[in-house]
């Protein structure tokens, strides 16, 4: 149904300010030197390395297939979902509009603020009042792995903070959907 575009490292905003991703945070915890290398790429001091890792390519494709199967499942159950096109410039605004409209699920939600950016796999509407109405949203990250890693928790926590800025209330839960189950944190 949809092919994911990867925005994994920091970038510059139109105002020449560096915007970080959840991956940058996780990478920095594991290797501060990688942060410096990525910074040099953003500043134009180094070329972005080209990755030809076929194993990672296969895993990425399997992940996309898993997300697509979840979308098909949602559609078969009659849920109203909204897909954000990652190639659109106004993905953040479309995400906020979908939240205000009360879509049951939002796929590839563009979440960003002045310092952080990312694409949440899914947002799910829940029965918790917010400035959106009688509902609010929580993040769902899809993972093929049966174990949740620290980087995943950092990612969904960061996305939850950005969601709170939009809806005026911090999500009660964060979720990770695996092929076997949905884990709620």
PLM region spans:
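Metal-dependent nuclease catalytic cores that hydrolyze phosphodiester bonds in DNA/RNA
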Residues: 7-132
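Nucleic-acid nuclease catalytic cores
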Residues: 111-185
């Amino acid at each position: 149904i949809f092919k994911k575009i990867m925005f994994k490292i920091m970038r510059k905003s139109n105002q020449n300010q560096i915007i970080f991703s959840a991956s940058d945070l996780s990478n920095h915890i594991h290797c501060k030197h990688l942060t410096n290398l990525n910074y040099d790429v953003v500043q134009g001091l180094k070329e972005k390395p080209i990755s030809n890792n076929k194993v990672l390519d296969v895993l990425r494709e399997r992940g996309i297939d898993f997300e697509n199967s979840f979308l098909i499942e949602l559609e078969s159950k009659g849920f109203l979902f909204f897909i954000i096109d990652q190639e659109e410039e106004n993905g953040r605004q479309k995400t906020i509009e979908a939240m205000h409209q009360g879509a049951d699920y939002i796929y590839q939600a563009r979440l960003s603020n002045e310092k952080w950016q990312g694409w949440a796999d899914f947002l799910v509407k829940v029965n918790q009042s917010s400035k959106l109405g009688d509902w609010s949203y929580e993040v769902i990250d899809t993972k093929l792995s049966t174990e949740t890693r620290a980087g995943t928790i950092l990612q969904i926590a960061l996305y939850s903070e950005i969601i709170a800025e939009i809806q005026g209330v911090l999500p009660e839960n964060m979720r990770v959907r695996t092929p076997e189950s949905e884990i709620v944190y």
